[in-house]
C-alpha cells in the first residue's frame, strides 16, 4: 500500500511517496517558488542523483499535477499508474479545538479547516489549496488531514488557558494550541519502543529543536503541556522568532519606533530570535561563529540552550518526574554542542550525558551514561512516516 504525503506551503510543496508495507520512501522532493519566477520541481529517488526541472508553476494544482506525472514516469519505475496510491495524507498546520486527531477529508471537514484560517492565516490557506487540487486530480483517492495541533489537544485547561479575560477564549479562541504535534508524537512513541516500556507508563520530555523549536511534556502518551502557544511565536528563542517576551514590549516599541502592529509582528517572527541577537539564523553558522570567538553568536547559543533547559526543568515539575528526554529535528538530532550545553543544567534531575555517545549525528541513540536516572536520547523525527501511518490507519479501518 502506497501513501502520498503532501505539505503545502504558501509558495512551496513538499511531497513524499511511501511504501507502507516496508515503511520505505519510494520518492520525495519539492516544488519551490510556486506562483513566482524561477519555480522548479525537485525529484529525489533512492540511490539516484536528484532531478531538477525548472518550469512555471502558477499554482498548487499545477504543481501537484506535475508531481503526479513524475511519479508515473515509466523510466523511474515508481508507479505504474495513479490508482496505486492508496491514500493522500495532508499536513495541516492548525486544527484549532475542532480536531483532536487525524480525519478523513470531506466537505464538512474542509469547511471546519477553513474556519480555522484566522488562527493560521499563512499556513491553512495553502493546505486547503492542496486538498482542493487533489480532489480535482485524484477524485477517487481518499484524503486524510493530519493536524500539527491535534496531539496537544489533550492538554488540561490549566495548561492551555492564558491569564487574560475569559471571554477572549470564548469569543476568539485565544488559548495555547501548540505545534510540531506530529513530531512530538512520533518521537515519544519511538522512545517507548527503544526503551521497551509501554508509553502509558512513561514521562517523556520531547525537544523538537530546529529553526522553529518547541518542547513538550508527554505523560502516559498524552501531551500535557508544550512551549508554543496561540501561535508558533511563543516559547523558545528560535532561528528568527523571539519566543517569550514581556507583552508590554510590543506597545512600548510601537510608540518608540512608530511601528504598526503588523510591523512589530513581522519583526518578532522574522527578524528576532538568534538572528536578532547574532545576525545569523542558521544554528550551524552560529556554532561556527561561536567557536571562532564571535561574542554575539556565543551569547545566542547560550540563551537558546538555557531556555531549552528551563523548559525541561519546568516540565519535569509539571509531570512530577521524567523518565526520558528526547532531542529531535535539525538541531536536536545533529548538534552535539547544543545537547551538551542543555544537559549541563540537568544534573539535578539525575540526567547525565555520556560525552562520547553524544558525538553522534542524526542517528537513533541513548546518549546518557549507564547510571543516569533519566535516559537522554536522540531520535530523528519522521513526520512524513507518522502522517502516512495515521492516513493508512484511517483509510483501512473506515
From Swiss-Prot:
| Positions bound to Mg(2+) | 7, 383
| One biological process term in Gene Ontology | acetyl-CoA biosynthetic process
Catalytic reactions on record: acetate + ATP = acetyl phosphate + ADP
What detail does the entry give on cofactor binding? Mg(2+). Can also accept Mn(2+).
Q: Which PROSITE patterns match?
A: ACETATE_KINASE_1, ACETATE_KINASE_2
GO cellular component, as recorded? cytoplasm
Q: Which residues bind substrate?
A: 91
Q: Where does ATP bind?
A: 14, 208-212, 282-284, 330-334
What does the record give as cofactor?
Answer: Mg(2+); Mn(2+)
Give the pathway listed in the UniProt entry for this protein: Metabolic intermediate biosynthesis; acetyl-CoA biosynthesis; acetyl-CoA from acetate: step 1/2
Q: Which residues form the active site?
A: 148 (proton donor/acceptor)
GO MF entry, a single one: magnesium ion binding
Compartment list: Cytoplasm
The record places the site described as Transition state stabilizer at 180, 241
EC number of the protein:
2.7.2.1
What highest taxon heads this organism's lineage?
Bacteria
Give the Gene3D superfamilies listed for this entry.
3.30.420.40
Family per record: Belongs to the acetokinase family.
Q: How does it assemble?
A: Homodimer.
| UniProt-recorded name of the protein | Acetate kinase
Organism encoding this protein: Carboxydothermus hydrogenoformans (strain ATCC BAA-161 / DSM 6008 / Z-2901)
Lineage in the entry?
A: Bacteria, Bacillati, Bacillota, Clostridia, Thermoanaerobacterales
Amino acid at each position: 500500500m502506497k501513501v502520498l504525503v503532501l505539505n503545502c506551503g504558501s509558495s512551496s510543496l513538499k511531497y513524499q511517496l511511501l511504501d507502507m508495507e516496508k515503511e520505505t520512501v519510494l520518492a520525495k522532493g519539492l516544488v519551490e517558488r510556486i506562483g513566482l519566477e524561477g519555480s522548479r520541481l525537485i525529484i529525489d529517488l533512492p540511490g539516484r542523483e536528484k532531478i531538477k526541472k525548472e518550469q512555471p508553476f502558477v499554482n498548487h494544482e499545477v504543481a501537484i499535477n506535475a508531481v503526479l506525472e513524475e511519479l508515473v514516469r515509466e523510466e523511474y519505475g515508481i508507479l505504474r499508474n495513479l490508482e496505486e496510491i492508496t491514500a493522500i495524507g495532508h499536513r495541516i498546520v492548525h486544527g484549532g479545538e475542532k480536531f483532536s486527531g487525524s480525519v478523513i477529508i470531506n466537505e464538512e471537514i474542509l469547511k471546519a479547516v477553513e474556519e480555522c484560517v484566522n488562527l493560521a492565516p499563512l499556513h491553512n490557506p495553502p493546505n486547503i489549496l492542496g486538498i482542493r487540487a487533489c480532489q480535482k486530480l485524484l477524485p477517487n483517492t481518499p484524503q486524510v488531514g493530519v493536524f500539527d495541533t491535534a496531539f496537544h489537544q489533550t492538554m488540561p485547561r490549566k495548561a492551555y488557558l492564558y491569564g487574560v479575560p475569559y471571554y477572549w477564549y470564548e469569543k476568539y479562541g485565544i488559548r495555547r494550541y501548540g505545534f510540531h504535534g506530529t513530531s512530538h508524537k512520533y518521537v515519544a512513541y519511538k522512545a517507548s519502543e527503544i526503551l521497551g516500556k509501554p508509553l502509558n507508563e512513561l514521562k517523556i520530555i520531547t525537544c523538537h529543536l530546529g529553526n522553529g523549536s518547541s518542547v513538550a511534556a508527554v505523560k502516559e502518551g498524552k501531551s500535557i503541556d508544550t512551549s508554543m502557544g496561540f501561535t508558533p511565536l511563543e516559547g523558545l528563542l528560535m532561528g528568527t522568532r523571539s519566543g517569550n517576551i514581556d507583552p508590554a514590549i510590543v506597545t512600548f516599541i510601537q510608540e518608540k519606533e512608530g511601528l504598526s502592529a503588523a510591523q512589530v509582528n513581522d519583526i518578532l517572527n522574522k527578524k528576532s530570535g538568534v538572528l536578532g541577537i547574532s545576525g545569523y539564523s542558521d544554528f550551524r553558522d552560529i556554532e561556527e561563529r561561536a567557536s571562532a570567538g564571535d561574542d554575539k553568536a556565543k551569547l545566542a547559543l547560550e540563551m537558546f540552550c538555557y531556555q531549552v533547559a528551563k523548559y525541561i526543568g519546568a516540565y519535569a515539575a509539571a509531570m512530577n518526574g521524567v523518565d526520558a528526554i528526547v532531542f529531535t529535528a535539525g538541531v536536536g538530532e545533529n548538534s552535539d554542542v547544543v545537547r551538551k550545553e542543555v544537559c549541563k543544567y540537568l544534573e539535578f534531575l539525575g540526567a547525565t550525558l555520556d560525552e562520547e555517545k553524544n558525538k553522534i549525528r542524526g542517528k537513533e541513540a541513548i546518549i546518557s551514561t549507564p547510571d543516569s536516572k533519566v535516559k537522554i536520547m536522540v531520535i530523528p523525527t519522521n513526520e512524513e512516516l507518522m502522517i502516512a501511518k495515521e492516513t493508512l490507519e484511517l483509510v483501512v479501518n473506515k
